Amino acid sequence: MGLSEKVEFKTLDGLVLRGFLYSARAKGPAIVMTPGFNFPVSLLYHEVALGFQAAGITALVYDPRSVGRSDGLPRSDINPAKQSEDFSDAITFLKTKPVVDPKRIALWGYSLSAAAALMAAGLDPRVKLVVAVCPAPVPYNFEAPGKRRKYLDLAIRDRESQARGKEPFYVQYIGDSEETALFDYRKQRGMEELEYDEVVENLTKIAPGFRNEVTIQTLRRLGSWSFADVPQRVGPTPVLQVFAVHEELEHIRKTQEAIWAGLTGPKERHTEDRGHMDVLTPDGHRFAHLVKVQVDFVLKNFAQRMR
């Protein structure tokens, strides 16, 4: 953390987003990074940012709106379309930094934020490339039997309740049953034998500010988010898409293959022998190689742009 500084910037709609800037030693390319679904900046993302910084790439990593240190109410109210817009405001902020070449700015995302990064790349011509780690436009199984109707009914009840001045409805994020939570942690690779309290405690340790809940309106937005044509809109922007061999949820695996097939511009595919939840775990040589793959992709493509 000694190689970074705390920063903040405003979104167009007036929220303050907070994070860390890892400035390179000399002027050069930069990359904007945000965590996955309902997750604040953690040690995992700092390790990746340090890898970019060491290679001469300035990295900005920040908490998404309503998560962690960033502003936004209600808390843990996830809005992928707004997260995509926030990427653009982060680019505007980075362009003010003397160490950043404004013509060489990339986006990096994981899970939901990877999908938001791809959407931003299709709408913001300042995005010159994207690193998409295990993109998941809808990171939970909204189509599971009974879930869509259950959550949509709750969302309407919540809107009526909030109209009467009540607090927003929340749903548990990670739990030990899909009946009561979005994710059953026991189905995630490496977590099968853990106790629920241990899982939440570990997440809170690595990501201070983690909240194990999201608003019901989050689910309504994700259920209505149209992502099918986003890969085609990315157009000529180069994309590195990282896959996990042991991606736990079938609907995410299918979506990732559809994203890959839909990308019409320059693209590279890299596969990790991990699951969705542990693909970014700093575990020695494997993780170091994954960071190198990303760094090499960014440097190679930006070098080509300089010719």
Swiss-Prot record:
Instruction: Note the InterPro entries from the entry.
Output: AB_hydrolase_1, AB_hydrolase_fold, Polyketide_trans_af380
Output the superkingdom of the source species: Eukaryota
Q: Which GO terms describe its molecular function?
A: hydrolase activity
The EC number of this protein is: 3.1.-.-
Q: Please tell me which top-level EC class this enzyme sits in.
A: hydrolase
Q: Which UniProt keywords apply?
A: Hydrolase
- Which Pfam families does the entry link to? Abhydrolase_6
Q: Which family does it belong to?
A: Belongs to the polyketide transferase af380 family.
User: What role does it play?
Assistant: Thiohydrolase; part of the gene cluster that mediates the biosynthesis of phaeospelide A, a fungal polyene macrolide with a 34-membered macrolactone ring and an all-trans conjugated hexaene structure. The HR-PKS ApmlA uses acetyl-CoA and malonyl-CoA as its starter and extender units, respectively, and provides the large carbon framework in phaeospelide via 16 cycles of polyketide chain elongation, which is the largest number identified in fungal iterative PKSs thus far.
The molecule here is called Thiohydrolase apmlB
Which organism was this protein described from? Arthrinium phaeospermum
